[in-house]
From Swiss-Prot:
Record-listed E.C. numbers: 3.4.14.10
Listed GO CC annotations: cytosol; nucleus
Boundaries of every Peptidase S8 domain copy: 9-508
Species assigned in the record: Bos taurus (Bovine)
Lineage: Eukaryota, Metazoa, Chordata, Craniata, Vertebrata
Protein name per UniProt: Tripeptidyl-peptidase 2
GO molecular function: aminopeptidase activity; serine-type endopeptidase activity; tripeptidyl-peptidase activity
Biased composition (Basic and acidic residues): 1003-1017
Length: 1249
């Protein structure tokens, strides 16, 4: 047996399938039509130029002609211009950069910028490098430092059982070092590499260099030109294996570092056009084709596509005169075939003859799950994913071959407006090249992302042959050839495979044989505002319906007017279904003609029905239809009271990959459904997909979708629940996973439940005190346990500024149509650490269908550090923020300034997740709610029975800090008592806040005011004049006022405090340290420390004016601590200054030593005195404690205080103090990592969009 297996040839043809599409047969017939002369734009995560198979074409040309990042995620602001001194410049990282003498720069001017590597590293690479850096750079050194610190601590503890006061500090020092090292390990965070970037003009072209070694020696780094000039690229190192190229824009002021954002794009390009000269069996479908790599997946958004990236990409596609676009991306859209992005795609296709191929989506098996643009845009060829028996053996190593099938997850049509959705299908899996940074040569991936480039490569073969033979073609003729020659698989439904599996050889023959002008035309089919007839809801199929269908020819761009005039098509219209009636003929000229089609679905059985009305040119009927009118009708099953609103099926047989669809008319009043699946098989476990979709006009299918992939064990049972909309048809689909082996039998039931609330969203205004809502059990007896939970509070922001300007050279559409941006700036305060979700309500949830080009927000802290970003789908971009102030910059782009100006006051919201959820009390009648008595618990509602509930307001002490008028809380209302009902039937709740209650004033202040009233006016004037002079004393650089007031008010403490603050805040502070000490002593001497200590020791104060006394004593203590700390800081600075001057020759060195000893004694005394009154980690004391530790060279204690200072005030200067202490302690690894954080935490400006 083993010998037989090893002798069997390896099925290489199944690794990257070409046989199924006729590509292999075509290349056997025409080996030179292998894609030569064809340029494919791959709009994806970017293509790695160093990946296997991405170097050359079959005729020796560069495989990748250009690599472009249109997202902006790799952009570096290089507007800062410097000139070297002595061959060196200081980069924005702070590193000294050595300019090699071999560089040519006639102007001597360099544009510099900085970029954090983790900003553009792919997520998987970032995670790998973080792990490797910790294991190789951090862990070995840190473990040794921690072991040494523990050893010293242990030795000291053994030698000093009863330490003195001085030894206590040494013990604390050693303990601090151990504590800090442990803390650094817990808080370890890798900033990643930080690269200095240089751009300059060498007299002929722009060049760029990135300091990838991070040591400033630029001779080690690669100098690059724009990739298109010489196909140059560099690599960030042997560990990363991340290849990169550059593009330079705006006269050197902007550098784009282009890397792949993921493995997806390289895999796609390898399928379409990979070429392996030594291993031709590994070739892509069109190895002779060239690639234009355009990165449209924004690394900042986890490679999500953006409007900016897509529109810039289409500009590049047009400018490079591409023949084909492969786009293996897409999202669900609220309305098909519409929006700015789709408009730009349509323009590229119809005006520039660019064939646009895209994935249909991976959201099946339910119908109408095609994504945008692949399955919803008229100009795009949407490709479904097919799996063949050879693929099952070669790629998936299945034990046995199964019949060819569509992947379970491949999206199905029709689109919401009736178009077929899926145009054609192609193999949806491959083992192909991936980027080098993955450390793999190849990888198995599947999806319509893989079927699209397979089809695209096949089309490239066709175009290669047509170009070689000078056969003219249009996007319309190529699409018609593909659809009319595709092979339909009998066991696969039309909505999954479209017109069938593409056949490259037959499509080529079709185009060579059918060269008439009519075949080069496109045809726009419209049914009102739709592109087909789609009858799905019960009301639509209850009676016959007439539909006016418009058919209009679409001419290729630059068609002569004479040809438009001469167009006269004699068309035959056919339908093969008895339930559809249409005219038999149509005369079509250069205008939109309308015909009437009648659809009568009354006699159709329950389920799904599809047919087409096809239009044939009677001059060449064998060429197939010129256009099709797709017609879909769904006849839904009904469930009613007699069946307990259940649909039950027993002992249902499932083969591998088999799908069973059930269309059900959801009963009016139903709000959720429960599905229960039971296995009847005792020997086979089975994988199933449970999928349900309801369509609502102008809502994407995902808005009312349920999806569950489950593994059902032998004789196992599972139950799931999902929300439904009453009165509309729902498709419930249960599908056996495509790769499952053996047959299986199951029972399953779909049961409907209904608890209807009067409002689809509950809006509660706290000002009303009590809010009512009513509930009805619509279908059957239901157990209720109403519960309202609030999980977030929402802050509404208005822009502080709105600035509009034209964008750069990358943002000009054909015919010099300039694009513009508006940047809106918002500020908000985060009251405490927590998770936030920013969003723009007007534009969010809109991407392809949006009328604006794009939206992108970036959030910054007060130091302009980028904290996070997001775009159209806010739920994907939640982030955790610490307490502080933040700025949000929102970019919106459009071609018309007037449309942008309308948004200059656009509101923006920030949703703050509550650390603890809040609940509202619910009562069954108004009186109970008014008195705050018995809350509603559990009750059972009979069918059709109505029950009111009353909600009371949230107590004021529960309102989150920072929330106020204009803010609201969000959460949900659940009504069902069952866990399944709670999970599925959820009603959104908004709770609107009002102003908080006015707090009563402090009684002590009132008493103070009363005592002030008793003073006569002259006394008041004298005191006011005194206080005014004290106020101005601190602003004037003079001692005159102080001396004057000291004579008049020798015992007035605030005067001495003001003098101390005046001296301590002066620019010449270091020259007046002795005066500061004297001023501090004056303050201290005017405080009765004994009386203060006695008061603090009191447990209670029974005196009637206790509040006033407490206030006065608190002020005295605060003043005393402040004076001690300022005195201590002045003494410490004096000693640190002297330490810096050690070694200097001086005649009075002995006198200085005595003075230093005296100052040190005074410092020590002040330190211990301070500890009597407060904790060393008090905010006021931290600076003094830090400086005291420095004087005593106790760097561990110093670093502990310095890190606390950073927490309180995270300035760059405070961080530099920490770094200095880390170096003094010998912890260079900590210092190095912290130094790399500085340019990230304190960038010179906001990052570019």
């Amino acid at each position: 047996m083993a010998t037989a297996a090893t002798e069997e040839p390896f099925p290489f043809h199944g690794l990257l399938p070409k046989k199924e599409t006729g590509a292999a047969a075509f290349l056997c017939r025409y080996p030179e039509y292998d894609g030569r002369g064809v340029l494919i734009a791959v709009l994806d995560t970017g293509v790695d130029p160093g990946a296997p198979g991405m170097q050359v074409t079959t005729d020796g040309k560069p495989k990748i002609i250009d690599i472009i990042d249109t997202t902006g995620s790799g952009d570096v602001n290089t507007a800062t211009v410097v000139e070297p001194k002595d061959g060196e410049i200081v980069g924005l990282s702070g590193r000294v950069l050595k300019i090699p003498v071999t560089w040519t720069n006639p102007s001597g001017r360099y544009h510099i910028g900085i970029k954090n590597g983790y900003d553009f590293y792919p997520k998987a690479l970032k995670e790998r490098i973080q792990k490797e850096r910790k294991e190789k750079i951090w862990d070995p050194v840190h473990r040794a430092a921690l072991a040494e610190a523990c050893r010293k601590q242990e030795e000291f503890d053994v030698a000093n059982n009863c330490p003195s006061q001085a030894n206590k500090l040494i013990k604390e020092e050693l303990h601090s070092q151990v504590e800090l090292l442990n803390s650094f390990e817990k808080k370890y965070s890798d900033p990643g590499p930080v690269y200095d970037c240089l751009v300059w003009f060498d007299g002929e072209t722009w060049r760029a260099c990135i300091d990838s070694s991070e040591d400033g020696d630029l001779s080690k780094s690669t100098v690059l030109r724009n990739y298109k000039e010489a196909q140059e690229y560099g690599s960030f190192g042997a560990a990363e294996m991340l290849n990169y190229s550059v593009n330079i824009y705006d006269d050197g002021n902007l550098l784009s570092i282009v890397t792949s954002g993921g493995a997806h794009g390289t895999h796609v390009a390898s399928i379409a056009a990979g070429h392996f000269p030594e291993e031709p069996e590994r070739n892509g479908v069109a190895p002779g084709a060239q690639i234009l790599s355009i990165k449209i997946g924004d690394t900042r958004l986890s490679t999500m596509e953006t409007g900016t990236g897509l529109i810039r990409a289409m500009i590049e596609v047009i400018n490079h005169k591409c023949d084909l676009v492969n786009y293996s991306y897409g999202e669900a859209t609220h309305w098909p075939n519409s929006g700015r992005i789709c408009e730009v795609i349509n323009e590229a296709v119809w005006k520039h003859n660019i064939i646009y191929v895209s994935s249909a989506g991976n959201n099946g098996p339910c119908l109408s799950t095609v994504g945008c643009p692949g399955g919803t845009t008229s100009s795009v060829i949407g490709v479904g994913a097919y799996v063949s028996p050879d693929m099952m053996v070669a790629e998936y190593s299945l034990r046995e071959k199964l019949p060819a099938n569509q992947y379970t997850w491949s999206s199905r049509g029709p689109s919401a407006d009736g178009a077929l959705g899926v145009s054609v299908s192609a193999p949806g899996g491959a083992i192909a090249s991936v980027p080098n940074w993955t450390l793999r040569g190849t990888q198995l991936m599947n999806g319509t992302s893989m079927s699209s480039p397979n089809a695209c490569g096949g089309i490239a073969l066709v175009l290669s042959g047509l170009k070689a033979n000078d056969v003219n073609y249009t996007v319309h003729s190529v699409r018609r050839a593909l659809e009319n020659t595709a092979v339909k698989a009998d066991n696969i439904e039309v909505f999954a495979q479209g017109h069938g599996i593409i056949q490259v050889d037959k499509a080529y023959d079709y185009l060579v044989q059918n060269t008439s002008f009519a075949n080069k035309l496109g045809f726009t089919v419209t049914v009102g505002t739709n592109r087909g007839i789609y009858l799905r809801d019960p009301v639509q199929v209850a009676a016959p319906s007439d539909h006016g269908v418009g058919i209009e020819p679409v001419f290729p761009e630059n068609t002569e007017n004479s040809e438009k005039i001469s167009l006269q098509l004699h068309l035959a219209l056919t339908s093969n279904s008895s339930w559809v009636q249409c005219p038999s003929h149509l005369e079509l000229m250069n205008q939109c003609r309308h015909v009437n089609i009648r659809v009568d679905p009354r006699g159709l059985r329950e389920g799904l029905h599809y047919t087409e009305v096809c239009g044939y040119d009677i001059a060449s009927p064998n060429a197939g239809p010129l256009f099709r009118v797709p017609i879909t009708a769904v006849i839904a099953a009904k469930v009613n009271e007699s069946t307990h609103y259940d649909l039950a099926l027993t002992d249902v047989h499932f083969k591998p990959g088999q799908i069973r669809r059930h269309f059900i008319e959801v009963p009016e009043g139903a709000t959720w459904a429960e599905v229960t699946v039971c296995s009847c098989s005792s020997e086979v476990s089975a994988k199933f997909v449970l999928h349900a979709v309801q369509l609502v006009k102008q809502r994407a299918y995902r808005s009312h979708e349920f999806y569950k992939f489950c593994s059902l064990p032998e004789k196992g049972t599972l139950t799931e629940a999902f929300p439904v909309l009453g009165g509309k048809a729902i498709e419930f689909c249960i599908a056996r996973w495509w790769a499952s082996l053996s047959d299986v039998n199951i029972d399953y039931t779909v049961s409907f439940h209904g608890i209807v609330c009067t409002a689809p969203q509950l809006n509660i205004h706290s000002s009303e005190g009590i809010n009512r809502f009513d509930v009805q059990s619509s279908l059957k007896y239901e157990d209720l346990a109403p519960c309202i939970t609030l999980k977030s509070w929402v802050q509404t922001l208005r822009p502080l500024s709105a600035k509009t300007k034209p964008l750069g050279s990358r943002d000009v559409l054909p015919n010099n149509r300039q694009l513009y941006e508006m940047i809106l700036t918002y500020n908000f305060h985060q009251p405490k650490s927590g998770e936030v979700t920013p969003s723009c309500p007007l534009l969010c949830e809109l991407l392809y269908e949006s009328e604006f080009d794009s939206q992108l927000w970036i959030i910054f802290d007060q130091n302009k550090r980028q904290m996070g970003s997001g775009d159209a789908y806010p739920h994907q971009y939640s982030l955790k923020l610490e307490k502080g102030d933040y700025t949000i910059r929102l970019q919106i782009r459009h071609e018309q300034i007037s449309d942008l100006e309308r948004l200059k006051d656009l509101p923006f919201i920030v949703s703050h997740r509550l650390s603890n959820t809040l609940s509202l009390d619910i009562h069954e009648n108004h009186s109970l709610a008014l008195l705050g008595k018995k809350k509603s618990s559990n009750l059972t509602l009979p069918p059709k029975y109505n029950q009111p509930f009353f909600v009371t307001s949230l107590p004021d002490d529960k309102i989150p800090k920072g929330a106020g008028p204009g803010c609201y809380l969000t959460g949900s209302l659940t009504l069902s008592k069952t866990e399944l009902g709670k999970k599925a039937d959820v009603i959104p709740v908004h709770y609107y806040l009002i102003s908080p209650p006015t707090k009563t004033k402090n009684g002590s202040k009132d008493k103070e005011k009363d005592s002030e009233k008793e003073k006569d006016l002259k006394e008041e004037f004298t005191e006011a004049l005194r206080d005014l002079k004290i106020q101005w004393m601190t602003k004037l650089d003079s001692s005159d006022i102080y001396n004057e007031l000291k004579e008049t008010y020798p015992n007035y403490l605030p005067l001495y405090v003001a003098r101390l603050h005046q001296l301590d805040a002066e620019k010449e502070r270091m020259k007046r340290l002795n005066e500061i000490v004297e001023a501090a002593n004056a303050v201290i001497s005017h405080i009765d420390q004994t009386a203060l200590a006695v008061y603090i020791a009191m447990k209670t104060d029974p005196r009637p004016d206790a509040a006033i006394i407490k206030n006065d004593m608190d002020k005295q203590k605060s003043t005393l601590v402040d004076a001690l700390c300022r005195k201590g800081c002045a003494l410490a600075d004096h000693l640190l200054q002297a330490q810096d001057q050690d070694g200097a020759v001086s005649s009075d060195s002995e006198g200085r030593e005595e003075e230093g000893e005296s100052t040190l004694d005074s410092l020590t005394e002040t330190f211990w005195e301070t500890t009597k009154w407060t904790d060393l980690f008090d905010n006021k004391v931290l600076t003094f404690a830090y400086k005291h530790a420095l004087v005593n060279k106790m760097y561990g204690r110093g670093l502990k205080f310095a890190t606390k200072l950073v927490e309180e005030k995270p300035t760059k200067e405070n961080w530099k103090n920490c770094i200095q202490l880390m170096k003094l302690l010998g912890w260079t690894h900590c210092a190095s990592f912290t130094e790399n954080w500085l340019p990230i935490m304190y960038p010179p400006d906001y990052c570019v969009f």
